[in-house]
Structures are given as C-alpha cells and as structure tokens.
Amino acid sequence: MNISKLPPLSPSVIRRILFYLLMLLFCQQLAMIFWRVGLPDNSPVASVQITPAQARQQPVTLNDFTLFGVSPEKNRSGALDASQMSNLPPSTLNLSLTGVMVGDDTARSIAIISKDNEQFSRGVNEEVPGYNAKIVSIRPDKVVLQYQGRYEVLGLYNQEENSADGVSGAQLNEQLQQRASTTMSDYVSFSPVMNDNKLHGYRLNPGPKSDSFYRVGLQDNDMAVALNGLDLRDEEQAKKAMERMADVHNFTLTVERDGQRQDIYMEFGGDE
C-alpha cells in the first residue's frame, strides 16, 4: 500500500481525532481521582524492630583464670577477731610503740611510733616508717601490723620485754614502772569527735589514774580543742601534738565547756 497515494486528512477529521484523544486523557484522570478518593486509606503496616539478642553472661577474660587459685578477699577494715588477736606473734621490727589514741571511730585512731629516736603518728591503713608494713588495727595497748604477708603485734612494752635478756628483774621492773608512769594515756583518754567528716576536737575522759584527771580540774567528756598551742581540730596539728606527747611530762590543754574555753595545766611522770 502506497501511503503517498492516501488522500490528505481534512481539518475536520484532524479536529475530531484530537478531540477523542483529549477525551481519553480526561477519562483516565477522572478514573485516577476516583480511585484515590473513593477507596479507604491503607492501614499502616506495623513495624517490627529486630535487635540482636543481648548476652546474659559476662564475657570471659584471661584475668578470670589463675594458675595457683584465687587468694581470699582482703579485709579492708583491718578488723581481726579475738581468736586471731590472741595468736599473733610479737613484731620483730625495730620499732617501739610510745602511745595510742583510740576513739569510737577506729579509722581516726592514732598510734605514736618511735624509730631511731624519732616520733611518728600513724593511723589505720598507713605504713609505718622505715618498713613496708601497714597498720591494720589500733588497740588501747597495741597495734597490729601487716608485714610481708603476715600479721604482727607491736605492744606498748615490746621494747622492754624484748630486752629482758641481760637485764636483771629489778632493772626490768624499774623500766616498766617508769614507762607506765610516763604514759599519758594512764591519766587522760582521748577520743576524736567527728561531725560531717570533720574533726571538732577530742573528748576527754579519765584514764586508769583518774585522781590526777579530776585534781587538775578536768571533767568527764570535756572537749579538748588545743594541746600545747596546737589546734586539735586540725588533723595535721593533732598528729603533731600526739607525736610530742611521748617526749613531754607537762602540757596545757585548752578545753571547751558550756561554750567557754579555759586552759588547764597538767603534769605527769612523777608519783601520783
């Protein structure tokens, strides 16, 4: 069929063809509008969040395995029961205990230790001078040390008792009496008073030799705020005061009673 021989389309035919095409497009648009408006909205599809399962067990590390077993848990407080205390050997360290200050709060207790004619004040969990030994407990008449993996006892009279060899009984007895007569704790008991973790002074009470305590004018539960000019409310100055007590035989206590302060002079070391 030869297209060139077809008769040309008249303008009326062309207009008619264009009209039908426009009508077809119009009907298509109407159908799409009806489809969107007439039908209900699709319900949202519930989303499911998938997360990997969490491990319920702790991961195993190399530190969990030991070649020789696990050592027992350390006693952080340093407290030992009565049976352990009674079986502890005396310390072999070249130290002497010259005084102790024990309060209700064991963490605030102070031990005064002498080494090479020097005085040091140490508390619980602190190392003693000259040795890799730590204080784990402070008692009224002794301290317990931890040295090279074992516990040892350093008593107030260790030095005299250990030097008994070559000393006569009379000389040893004289040394012990002299030591006992110059121990400040025989006259006054100091107990630190804490408030909001701050040192407010030391509560005073009579020691075994209570006559001297009351004779100088002290009363039960007096609050000491200074000793020989050192502020007992400052922990560093309080430690210095405790260190010096072993070398002095008289001191001035500043006590606070009923809101008033007064200085009380006390001398010890002689026969009471």
From Swiss-Prot:
<keyword id="KW-1003">Cell membrane</keyword>
<dbReference type="GO" id="GO:0015628">
    <property type="term" value="P:protein secretion by the type II secretion system"/>
</dbReference>
<protein>
    <recommendedName>
        <fullName>Type II secretion system protein C</fullName>
    </recommendedName>
</protein>
<feature type="topological domain" description="Periplasmic">
    <location>
        <begin position="36"/>
        <end position="272"/>
    </location>
</feature>
<comment type="similarity">
    <text>Belongs to the GSP C family.</text>
</comment>
<keyword id="KW-0813">Transport</keyword>
<keyword id="KW-0653">Protein transport</keyword>
<keyword id="KW-0472">Membrane</keyword>
<keyword id="KW-1133">Transmembrane helix</keyword>
<comment type="function">
    <text>Involved in a type II secretion system (T2SS, formerly general secretion pathway, GSP) for the export of proteins. Required for the translocation of the multiple pectic enzymes.</text>
</comment>
<keyword id="KW-0812">Transmembrane</keyword>
<dbReference type="GO" id="GO:0015627">
    <property type="term" value="C:type II protein secretion system complex"/>
</dbReference>
<feature type="topological domain" description="Cytoplasmic">
    <location>
        <begin position="1"/>
        <end position="16"/>
    </location>
</feature>
<dbReference type="GO" id="GO:0005886">
    <property type="term" value="C:plasma membrane"/>
</dbReference>
<dbReference type="InterPro" id="IPR024961">
    <property type="entry name" value="T2SS_GspC_N"/>
</dbReference>
<dbReference type="InterPro" id="IPR036034">
    <property type="entry name" value="PDZ_sf"/>
</dbReference>
<feature type="transmembrane region" description="Helical">
    <location>
        <begin position="17"/>
        <end position="35"/>
    </location>
</feature>
<dbReference type="Pfam" id="PF11356">
    <property type="entry name" value="T2SSC"/>
</dbReference>
<keyword id="KW-0997">Cell inner membrane</keyword>
<dbReference type="InterPro" id="IPR001639">
    <property type="entry name" value="T2SS_protein-GspC"/>
</dbReference>
